[in-house]
């Protein structure tokens, strides 16, 4: 928990800010005193969210419909934010799309849809705001939401894995290249955080009744929205001013559990271990 008004005076753009994790992060930013622009393609959802968050937090939130795949639309969204708030301090690239499928069943268009939203959208927003910050000699902070499999890949979500890996490379590359301008670039790699839209696409029936996403997490639970919002708020605040080029995993230990060759032995009962020990002593 950051102190009250830890983000006072800052203006933050959150793509995909109308629902799910984007909304949760926006809520906390507002509670900490920031002004926030939320953007997605669905203006009705954005306006409903903005009205609810104004009432809930008393903060200033601007809803702008924007297709991040289109650079001109991104530039217009940023310009409108400057008109409203006078400055932009933080860009949070959160817009995403995902679904599960054997790769050979995908059309090239299905691949393009995900890569265009996740990778091209993040690049468009980053380039547009970065150009303005550099021209105006203003420091800034970029925070990208990736995923744990951005580093190692994952079967059956190849478009998302490819796009998120690209965003991860973008994060680390610009952390070095733009540091001289006072621009920090970091990322968060969440594990399982249940959201209504993504969850239904990644765990449709019959998978939902057969797979327990929490089962592979050592803490034996999925993440809570506020936990991710806490981390995001820290990374966009001045308290993390020396953090640059980092990808922070927040997954309850799931990634490490899957990486260890013998981690699955956790399922063995004490009796099974007794048998193994007796066998090894022979």
Question: Where on the chain are the PLM-derived regions?
Answer:
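Conserved glycine-rich cofactor-binding loop
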Residues: 16-20
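Active-site helix of classical SDR
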Residues: 126, 163, 171
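Active-site loop-to-helix junction immediately N-terminal to the catalytic Tyr of the SDR YXXXK motif
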Residues: 106, 153-162, 173, 198-201
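Short, small/polar-rich loop/turn modules that mediate ligand/substrate recognition or access, typified
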Residues: 92, 179, 184, 243-245
